Amino acid sequence: MTTFCISCDISYLDDMLQHMSKLGLSNFLILDRVLGKYPQGEPRLDSSIWPGYNAMIIIQVTEDEAEQLKTLILRINQESLTNLEYVYW
């Protein structure tokens, strides 16, 4: 088993969950209002200076599911218009 901590802008959470559902991944935890800064993009600190926040999905998967999830996240990031839309794990 592998544990993923997937983080994305809150506005992309529903899309991410739909993609995961198509892979048959339905057991997970969601942490709402996750604040922070990633290597790409601007900080999301839910403040007047750095608006916005992330959501985090925590999921345990098999090795096969882990490969599918990595492929999914890489594809989402390649199709992103800006680094503000990136999904991190």
Tell where the protein language model's regions lie, with residue ranges.
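Positively charged, small/polar-rich N-terminal and surface patches that mediate targeting and assembly
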Residues: 1-89
